[in-house]
Amino acid sequence: MSSEFEDCIARGGVAVFPADTVYGLACDPTSREAIARLYALKGRPADKPAAVMFFTLGRALTALPELGPRTRRALEALLPGAVTLLLANPLARYPLACGHDPWTLGLRVPAPGVLSDVTLPVMQSSANRSGGADPRSLDEVDEALREGADLVVDGGTLPGTPSTVADLRAYGSHGRWEVLRTGAVSSDDIAGALAAR
């Protein structure tokens, strides 16, 4: 399934896929056309940011060599896992996924699953209409989204709680962080993981 998924993304397609939290939509984060299709399926404004997902932490760290040592240690403490990390993005990597702020990158590395062998990064967003409920199973994914996608990957029933969003933009320089959206991982768990590093 990983090869089919990679082929879909590389061709500029949009896929419904299972993350470690809820079902998502994925596309090539460097393709303006693919991103426009994904946002059109969701009914989401094109200037809203979305996370870039790597399927292993090693690939994420390789793609972002400019990360400082403190930030890299934080990523090693928190990922893979059900957190979306907002990072300072001084080189404006993946600007099409960053919305109106190319200097902030949302990063996701899910816990291992059916797509762990995928080598390409994807831009990802939950597989729902903008503002809709987060789908735990394919049956809960809107029919129009399933039909509009080029590939649908079934990962069974998922936990159903979206990722926690944590802002680490000031972590590298000042050690500061904050949770912007509470989700599958608690603030206490994040604090504990960071303190252990």
Regions found by a protein language model. Give the residues of each.
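Active-site-adjacent structural elements in enzyme catalytic cores
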Residues: M1-R197
